[in-house]
Amino acid sequence: MGLVNIMRFITFAYIICGGFILTRTSGTSASASPATPTTNTGEGTSSPVTPTYTTSTDSNNSTATNNSTDVNGTEATPTPSHPHSHENTITCTNSLISVPYYTSVTINCSTTVSVNHSEYRLEIHLNQRTPFSDTPPGDQENYVNHNATKDQTLLLFSTAHSSAKSRRVGQLGVIPDRLPKRQLFNLPAHTNGGTNFPLNIKSIDWRTAGVYVWYLFAKNGSLINSTSVTVLTYNAPLMDLSVHPSLKGENHRAVCVVASYFPHNSVKLRWYKNAKEVDFTKYVTNASSVWVDGLITRISTVSIPADPDEEYPPSLRCSIEWYRDEVSFSRMAKAGTPSVFVAPTVSVNVEDGAAVCTAECVPSNGVFVSWVVNDHLPGVPSQDVTTGVCSSHPGLVNMRSSRPLSEENGEREYNCIIEGYPDGLPMFSDSVVYDASPIVEDMPVLTGIIAVTCGAAALALVVLITAVCFYCSKPSQVPYKKADF
């Protein structure tokens, strides 16, 4: 009896211990299982968070659900779906590449799964875009780019397009534009079961800059995974300043040229007069142009009225800020002072068988007289002399130049031109017409002879008339005979 009770007690204790051990084991397993992440919905409750996977992102933050086209306009629409596995991923060595213009770039991307044509399809797309299209840091450029194509998505490569099929769907990896058709990319090889899909871009420019996206699709067309690489390019501007000479009292003018830069809208330009910023809306005009290579050239012209109270011409400075990207920029500036000239007074006369040119208020150095006769440069040298100082403008002088008249018959135009002034100023000149024909030269002598002859004839006529009148005024006498006495 006692033995039976002891056996029952041992059995009961064994059952209790076994249940306790099972309970501890279940609790430990439950505590070790991963909890579902939650997020606050903003209403005091939490909801589970479903893991998401990044697809593609273009300049407008669009995903892989956007339609894309190949070079022939055929739509290729990736179908979004949840990834089949966390391990079926695409990795690239870089997610952002920024290189100088015309640089060759290779993007190395690989998959963790062998892309068998019977199970998967891999595609490479290019989302063309222009940097700073949303919030450009530079000035707005007023030009029309006839070369550029609209931002679009292009299909560059697909493992579903074998060499035999590619002849039917068109050539991939070629961007249509006004330039001659040429291969811009070295595309991956069509290898069944491959894992490496490098893309070589032969030249990064306005056509090939953008977001490149690698898509991995399942056999049924659902999207498994994707990754994107943003490729940016830049080209530093060349700057030149030309300050134009001006006449006293006229506007001061200067032209600033910022050439061959990229990206678009990446240059901020300002003008300064003696370190004071110039009003852009009143005194500055701008023009921009884009060349066939996609680089931009900007021409800015400033024209400021002369201040009569200023003793000296002002300093004009063109300053630019060029933004290579959203965070990197550099400054450049050039300055110059315009040369101000007094307009000379030029006159030409004929004196003593020579054409004489007088120029008043000209610079004492670098200025000379050039003669042109009937639009031809004469072979006869001229004689230039300084006759004195300009009374109205100290520091300037008066000049006199003469040259013999032509001995040829007919009219001749003698044009006196003051040379030596810089380009950009008007031409200072004067002219006179002289006829050297013999009939014209003998006319004064003939006129004198005729005048003397007429005078002598008139005098003789007067004497004759006077004599006749005197004779007629005497009393008449009757003749007599000697016999009458």
From Swiss-Prot:
Residues 469-485 are cytoplasmic. This is Envelope glycoprotein C. Interacts with host complement component C3; this interaction inhibits host immune response by disregulating complement cascade. The lineage of its organism: Viruses, Duplodnaviria, Heunggongvirae, Peploviricota, Herviviricetes. GO terms for cellular component: membrane; virion membrane. The chain crosses the membrane at residues 445-468. Glycans are attached at N60, N61, N66, N67, N72, N108, N116, N147, N220, N225, N286. Coiled coil: none annotated. Residues 237-330 form the Ig-like domain.
